[in-house]
Amino acid sequence: MLDLDTVRNDPRRVKEALRAKGIGSPDLVDTLLEIDETRRSAITELQDVQSRQNELSQQIGALKREGKDEEAEAIIEKTGRMKEKINRLKEEVQEAEARQEELVLELPNIPHPSVPVGADEDDNEVEATVGEMPAFDFDPAPHWELADRHNLVDLERGAKVAGSGFPFYLGKGARLQRALLNFFLDRARERGYTEMQAPLFVNPESAKGTGQIPDKDALMYEIPRDDFYPIPTAEVPVTNFHRDEILAADDLPRRYCTYSPCWRREAGSYGSDVRGLNRLHQFDKVELVRIVPPDESYRALDALLEDAESALDALDLPYRRLLMCTGDMGFTQAKVYDLEVWSAAQERWLEVSSVSNFEAFQARRAQIRYRLEPEAKPELVHTLNGSGLAFPRIVAALLENNQQPDGSIELPEALHPYTGFARIGAEA
């Protein structure tokens, strides 16, 4: 959530952010300022009327003691009318504040000055490409064929049991999932993250705290009867762990890692891009979250990015780092990098991680603050998160990039202690 003072003092900057991100209309800023002016005028008038009412009320007792009952009754009648006006003005202020809060939640975060201005994914900047793309002397099979051949994933039965995009993992496919879970969590713990097991459902306040509401409301599954949302990412419960709290300076920085299933409706996803494990409604992910003082957040972003990239390095997967342009950023992000792995059979890049700095945007919504000194005024923290990493496309890349002429798949050495096997297929 943006600070209202920013909207009041620099509306042009906020409008530019709306245009740059392609989210909402700049007219929203004007509407918000009009409501803000109405609210402030009503507050001023309310204070004036209350002050006058208090002055008159003090006169009533004196007039009665002096036997001036008629004058006292006239003032009582007048203060009664003033009370009606006070109640009306209070309602006006409350209505304006409610509408103001509703509208300010629709304003996206302002991009950091270092973010390139652009309309869509074509304007993202490739900052680095790491690793060598595999070369084959045969036609590599896509991961969905390999998974079917080796009985690793069953999408058809998943569709029968739940619906499209809800896979079963079988045998070595299930063991590979579990191996990735432990591999990613162990690496995060070694890098100073505190492991956490978080709730898989959140309430609307938590979804609002991290910005999923109202921006991604339509992309989340919902359980209306109990007022819950199955989490679209563990960012939501982990960041809200400190919602409505004031931390001490010594408590920062905080680093958390957690594994969770995630659920996303992914409305409007069709075609070849969604085949196999490319896009699912239920998937597994390890999430990395950092909560830091404001002056440390961009150093923390670099460190978080390195944490995610190091896992890809360890898996020997070729990948590239993208700095996302304004038009391809999310609603809540001030700056974001995407990490994409190379898919050898599909011959395209697959996103496996977004690493983001939200600055104070989420902290203001969730009221996560800290004190530099015990008696100091609380200040907002900065929040960051990144996937470390999302499993499905990692599995897709591992299968496609490491397939052998005999149809088997050789797994990277870093996973062998976790899987208990080095190869899938060819009767390893």
Swiss-Prot record:
PROSITE patterns: AA_TRNA_LIGASE_II
Gene3D superfamilies: Bira Bifunctional Protein, Domain 2, Serine-tRNA synthetase, tRNA binding domain
Residues spanning the membrane: none
Catalytic activity: tRNA(Ser) + L-serine + ATP = L-seryl-tRNA(Ser) + AMP + diphosphate + H(+); tRNA(Sec) + L-serine + ATP = L-seryl-tRNA(Sec) + AMP + diphosphate + H(+)
Gene Ontology cellular component annotations, sorted alphabetically: cytoplasm
One GO MF term attached to the UniProt entry: serine-tRNA ligase activity
UniProt superkingdom: Bacteria
Binding-site positions, ATP: 264-266, 351-354
Pfam family, one: Seryl_tRNA_N
Pathway: Aminoacyl-tRNA biosynthesis; selenocysteinyl-tRNA(Sec) biosynthesis; L-seryl-tRNA(Sec) from L-serine and tRNA(Sec): step 1/1
Positions contributing to L-serine binding: 233-235, 287, 387
UniProt keyword list: Aminoacyl-tRNA synthetase, ATP-binding, Cytoplasm, Ligase, Nucleotide-binding, Protein biosynthesis
Subcellular location: Cytoplasm
UniProt-listed GO biological process terms: selenocysteine biosynthetic process; seryl-tRNA aminoacylation
InterPro entries noted in UniProt: aa-tRNA-synt_IIb, aa-tRNA-synth_II, aa-tRNA-synth_II/BPL/LPL, Ser-tRNA-ligase_type_1, Ser-tRNA-synth_1_N, SerRS_1_N_sf, SerRS_core, tRNA-bd_arm
Alphabetical list of PANTHER family matching this protein: SERINE--TRNA LIGASE, SERYL-TRNA SYNTHETASE
Domains as described in the record: Consists of two distinct domains, a catalytic core and a N-terminal extension that is involved in tRNA binding.
Matching NCBIfam families: serS
Complex formation: Homodimer. The tRNA molecule binds across the dimer.
Protein name: Serine--tRNA ligase
Organism: Salinibacter ruber (strain DSM 13855 / M31)
